[in-house]
């Protein structure tokens, strides 16, 4: 079996909470080469792309779903956007839940839209990470 438009709306279980720490914020800012003071100091906020640290944990459920037959080595991440309600702060505990929002098939390529909802453990919605993935099925699986 492989992914199809019938999978649109499929939502995976929420990830375990991730504790945002000043150290992790600084590590990402350093990796990005961004020395903005907002990402350092006593009360740092996370760079907007910190969403991918959280979203990638939710992606694991998608790739582990044997019914979809998605293979990471056949995947290209083609588009990404973030919509934040508020920045992440040190001490935030955040969960992520992935939903398949679209699937289009062209030949042996599946174009998959996903949305990862990012929420504080207290229920506050923090933002979304939206992605488009291109998955090419091996020959014979089209």
Curated annotation (Swiss-Prot):
Pfam families for this protein: FAS1_DH_region
Family membership noted in the UniProt record: Belongs to the UPF0336 family.
InterPro entries named among the record's database cross-references: FAS1-like_DH_region, HadA-like, HotDog_dom_sf
Chain coiled-coil ranges: none
Domain of life: Bacteria
Protein name: UPF0336 protein PPA1896
